[in-house]
Amino acid sequence: MARIAGVDLPREKRIEIALTYIFGIGLSRSKQILRDTGVDPNKRVKDLTDDEVAKIRDYIDKNFKVEGELRAEIARNIKRLIDIRCYRGLRHLRGLPVRGQRTRTNARTRKGPRKTVGVMRKKS
C-alpha cells in the first residue's frame, strides 16, 4: 500500500482517484500532479513502482500544503478572523453561516439540530 503525505492510498483504485483521498488534493490537482511527474493516471496504486511513488511524494511535498499542515493553516486563518473581531470571525464564533446565506429558515448545517422550544401550561 502506497503511503503519501501520511495517508494510505487504496491499492485497487486508479492513482488519479486514489490521490484525492489526501486532504487538499482534488481531482484536478491530482491530474496536474500526475501530468507533471509523468505517471500514467490510469495505473492502479498496486502497480506503481517505488520510484513513481517517491516522485509523486516529493512533488506533493515541494509544491502543496496538504493534510495536517493545510488543516492547521485553515484553523489559524479562522482564529485570526475571530481575534480581529471582524464580521466573518463573529459568524464563525457564533456557528452561523459565514458567506451571506439566509438564517431565518434553513442554515441547519451550521446551526445544528433544532432546539425544541416548549410551552408551560397552567395546571387545571
Swiss-Prot record:
Name this polypeptide is given: Small ribosomal subunit protein uS13
A biological process term (GO) from this entry: translation
Organism: Caldicellulosiruptor saccharolyticus (strain ATCC 43494 / DSM 8903 / Tp8T 6331)
The keyword Transmembrane is annotated on this UniProt entry: no
A single GO cellular-component term on record: small ribosomal subunit
Coiled coil: none
Family note: Belongs to the universal ribosomal protein uS13 family.
Molecular functions (GO terms): rRNA binding; structural constituent of ribosome; tRNA binding
Region (Disordered): 99-124
Subunit details: Part of the 30S ribosomal subunit. Forms a loose heterodimer with protein S19. Forms two bridges to the 50S subunit in the 70S ribosome.
Basic residues bias: start-end ranges: 101-124
Pfam families recorded: Ribosomal_S13
Gene (UniProt): rpsM
Organism classification: Bacteria, Bacillati, Bacillota, Bacillota incertae sedis, Caldicellulosiruptorales
Functional summary from the UniProt entry: Located at the top of the head of the 30S subunit, it contacts several helices of the 16S rRNA. In the 70S ribosome it contacts the 23S rRNA (bridge B1a) and protein L5 of the 50S subunit (bridge B1b), connecting the 2 subunits; these bridges are implicated in subunit movement. Contacts the tRNAs in the A and P-sites.
Alphabetically ordered keywords of this record: Ribonucleoprotein, Ribosomal protein, RNA-binding, rRNA-binding, tRNA-binding
